[in-house]
């Protein structure tokens, strides 16, 4: 699998993808799979690369540790970038009549008390999950909050004056080494705690909350989950118009990503790099060799477009102002970013 290359012709792109993925599918059924999985998407092929050497479906990540049939993989699907998409969720609804483990009232419905007694009732109860891929999380206003909850407008009649209901799509369980905070709001990242411990805490909370666990998962189970997800790197590996994104001198794809240096403060534009290294505004050099289109004429326009996008990201000036914790802390009304 390591040397597999996908090439696209304008007329044969769909057929090539079908054949390519069919081959992958026949090799991906054992308990301990190879270290690469490929999935077609609307613009080409995405790849999941496992730095640990393989996707072991015997891992606790795939086991239901709670009481409602859910596992981590219920909301973190390999073929959907290790999150979920409305399209994938809708397909699961139709196949299961809305009884797949992702469809649980505790947080999949617009309200935990929503009617799920019939297929149509479930379709209505899970409409935000079906149409937007959103999970409901209700949390109280934290002590010392810098805001007040003064009004509630809830079309589902499910929020009270002390809790805030938030609908969020599950974050990808991939590329986790690059996180500076865990969860949308960073609540799993208290000051001074390591990323590993943050992910352990997040996994435990997911089991007890989303999976409605009756028993707190063991340290061994949590370590198993975190070790697995920490080894996953996911990225687009081939484009239907530009071809392979990680060959012939360019460096896209998840394997290259797995080799990327990273630490908190790396290449910091405000001078906070712990090594003291100066900021380099040329953040990305993945596709420099495509500035001229490369050596494949049929793909040159798309490749040059990708290279231009990289240049824009690196060089287009963006004035940053009015950001609490940044402009005020530094005493700079405007900070130029790119």
What is the role of each PLM region?
Residues 28-338:
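Periplasmic c-type cytochrome electron-transfer domains
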């Amino acid at each position: 699998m390591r040397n597999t290359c996908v090439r696209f012709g304008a007329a044969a792109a769909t057929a090539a993808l079908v054949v390519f993925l069919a081959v992958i599918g026949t090799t991906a059924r054992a308990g301990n799979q190879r270290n690469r999985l490929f999935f077609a998407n609307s613009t080409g092929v995405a790849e999941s690369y496992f730095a640990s050497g393989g996707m072991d479906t015997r891992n606790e990540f795939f086991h239901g540790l709670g009481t409602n049939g859910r596992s981590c993989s219920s909301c973190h699907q390999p073929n959907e970038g290790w999150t979920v998409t409305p399209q994938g969720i809708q397909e699961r609804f139709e196949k299961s009549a809305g009884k797949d483990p992702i469809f649980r009232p505790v947080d999949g419905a617009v309200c935990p008390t929503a009617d799920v007694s019939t297929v149509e009732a479930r379709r209505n109860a899970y409409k935000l999950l079906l149409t937007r891929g959103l999970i409901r999380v209700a949390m109280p206003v934290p002590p010392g909050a810098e805001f007040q909850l003064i009004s509630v407008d809830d079309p589902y009649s499910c929020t009270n004056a002390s809790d805030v209901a938030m609908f969020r799509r599950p974050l990808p369980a991939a590329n986790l080494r690059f996180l500076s905070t865990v969860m949308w709001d960073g609540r799993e990242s208290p000051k001074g705690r390591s990323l590993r411990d943050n992910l352990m805490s997040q996994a435990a909370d997911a089991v007890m909350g989303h999976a409605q666990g009756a028993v707190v998962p063991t340290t061994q189970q949590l370590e198993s989950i975190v070790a697995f997800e920490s080894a996953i790197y996911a990225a687009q590996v081939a484009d239907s118009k530009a071809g392979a994104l990680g060959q012939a001198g360019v460096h896209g794809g998840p394997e290259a990503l797995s080799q990327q240096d990273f630490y908190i403060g790396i290449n910091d534009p405000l001078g906070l790099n712990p090594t003291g290294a100066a900021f380099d505004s040329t953040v990305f050099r993945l596709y420099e060799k495509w500035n001229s289109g490369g050596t494949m004429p049929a793909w040159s326009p798309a490749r040059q477009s990708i290279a231009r996008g990289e240049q824009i990201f690196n060089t287009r000036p963006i004035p940053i102002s009015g950001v609490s914790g940044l402009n005020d802390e530094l005493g700079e009304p405007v900070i130029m970013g790119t």
